[in-house]
Design a protein with these regions (language model features):
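Phosphate-binding glycine-rich loops and their immediate beta-loop-alpha structural context
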Residues: 1-41, 45-53
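Loop/turn-to-beta-strand initiation segments
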Residues: 4-6, 33-36, 67-71, 124-129
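Short, ordered loop/turn segments at secondary-structure junctions
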Residues: 11-15, 40-44, 76-78, 135, ...
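Well-ordered alpha-helical segments embedded in enzymatic catalytic cores
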Residues: 18-21, 52-55, 59, 107-111
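Short acidic, glycine/serine/threonine-rich loops at helix termini
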Residues: 19-24, 48-52, 82-88, 140-145
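Conserved helix-loop functional segments at active or binding sites
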Residues: 21-29, 58-65, 86, 113-117
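Phosphate-binding/switch loop-helix module in NTP-utilizing enzymes
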Residues: 48-84
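Conserved catalytic/coupling modules of large nucleotide/cofactor-utilizing molecular machines
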Residues: 62, 79, 89-322
C-alpha cells in the first residue's frame, strides 16, 4: 500500500465463500483501490479455471509494459495442476507421474517466465509472481511443490504444527529458503538479523532436547530464554504486518542485549508498545530509518539515546514499564 505497486489476486478452483472472504478482507483494509481480482471458482467450467492465471498474467503484462510495477498472487497452482490433469485425461492424453500429463512442468515454468524486470528503454516496469501450492500432510517433496520450488527464487513454507503452537505467521525457517536473500534486504535489516535464522533454529533444536532431558545448566536456560524472546519478536498478529523501520529498532534493542533480562510477558509488552514510545520520544527516528535503510552513525547514535531513555523510564524493567 502506498508503494505504487498494482496487485493482482488470482483465485483458481476455490469456493465462492473463500472468494468472498478474501474480497471482504481486501475491502476492509482499503486494498481494493490498487488490487485487481481474477477469479475462477470451483463452480465454473474447468476451461475457465485453467485460463484464469493466464488472464492474470496478461493483465499484469499490460501494466508492466507501461512502466508499472505489478505483484501477481496465484491461489493456487495445485488446483490449476488438477484442472490441467482433468482436461488432459478428458482429451485422452497419455498420463505420467501421478496421472499428470508429461508437460505439466512446462505448463507452469512457461508461466513463471513471464515475470520480469524490464530495462529502462523497455519502460522499466516489473512483474513479480507469488504462486501458492498446497502440500499433502506437509510433504514438500510432492510432484507439484518440487516443480515449483525448482522454478522460483525461493519458498516460504507454512507449517501446520507451528500454527497449532501459536507461532504466527507459521513460517518454518528450516524449510523456507531465499535464493536472493540479503541482496534485496535493507542493509540495516541485514546487519541486525544476519544470524537470527541460525539462532532460532538452534533454539528449536535445544528446546527439543530440553523436553527429553530435564536437567540443564545455567547456560542452557539462558539460551532457551533468549530463544523464546526471539520467537516472540518475529511473531506478527493476523493482518498486522510490522513495518521494517520498527523491526530495525526492535532488533537493535535485541542485538544490544537489552531484552535478555526481560520475562516473556514483558518482552511481549515491550514489543507491543515500542512503536508508540519511539514516536513519542524520537518522532523523526522511524522516518530516518525508512529513508536511509541503513544504520548510519547518526541513526546508531539516536538508537543508543533511545536505549538510554528506555533504561531511564523503566521500559526494560522486568516488572512493568512506563
Amino acid at each position: 500500500k502506498g508503494r505504487g505497486v498494482l496487485c493482482i489476486y488470482c483465485l483458481i478452483g476455490k469456493s465462492e465463500s473463500a472468494l468472498n472472504k478474501v474480497l471482504q478482507l481486501l475491502e476492509e483494509y482499503g486494498a481494493l483501490e490498487y488490487t485487481i481480482v481474477v477469479a475462477a471458482t470451483a463452480a465454473m467450467p474447468p476451461g475457465q479455471q485453467y485460463l484464469a492465471p493466464y488472464s492474470a498474467c496478461s493483465i499484469g503484462e499490460h501494466f508492466m509494459n507501461k512502466g508499472g510495477h505489478v505483484l501477481v498472487g496465484f491461489d493456487d497452482f495445485t488446483r490449476h495442476a488438477w484442472i490441467y490433469r482433468e482436461l488432459s485425461l478428458l482429451l485422452e492424453r497419455s498420463p505420467g507421474r501421478e496421472a499428470y500429463p508429461g508437460d505439466i512442468f512446462y505448463l507452469h515454468s512457461q508461466m513463471i517466465e513471464r515475470a520480469a524486470y524490464l530495462l529502462e528503454e523497455q519502460s522499466g516496469g516489473s512483474m513479480t509472481f507469488l504462486p501458492i501450492v498446497e502440500t499433502l500432510q506437509g510433504d514438500v517433496t510432492g510432484y507439484i511443490p518440487t516443480n515449483l520450488i525448482s522454478m522460483t527464487d525461493g519458498q516460504v513454507y507454512l507449517s501446520t504444527a507451528l500454527f497449532s503452537e501459536g507461532f504466527k505467521p507459521a513460517i518454518d525457517l528450516g524449510l523456507s529458503i531465499s535464493r536472493i536473500g540479503s541482496k534485496v534486504q535493507w542493509p540495516a535489516i541485514k546487519e541486525l538479523s544476519g544470524m537470527l535464522r541460525l539462532e532460532y533454529l538452534q533454539y528449536r533444536e535445544l528446546e527439543k532436547l530440553a523436553r527429553v532431558k530435564s536437567a540443564g545448566g545455567e547456560e542452557i536456560e539462558k539460551r532457551l530464554r533468549k530463544g523464546r524472546i526471539v520467537t516472540e519478536l518475529i511473531k506478527q498478529d493476523k493482518n498486522r504486518p510490522v513495518p521494517l523501520e520498527e523491526q530495525v529498532v526492535l532488533f537493535y534493542f535485541f542485538r544490544q542485549g537489552k531484552l535478555d533480562p526481560l520475562s516473556l510477558e514483558e518482552a511481549k509488552k515491550f514489543k507491543a508498545t515500542l512503536a508508540e514510545r519511539v514516536l513519542k520520544e524520537k518522532p523523526d527516528l522511524l522516518k530516518a530509518i525508512r529513508e536511509k535503510k541503513t544504520l548510519t552513525p547518526e541513526i546508531k547514535e539516536e538508537l543508543d539515546r533511545l536505549i538510554q531513555i528506555a533504561s531511564d523510564k523503566g521500559w526494560l524493567q522486568e516488572k512493568g514499564g512506563a
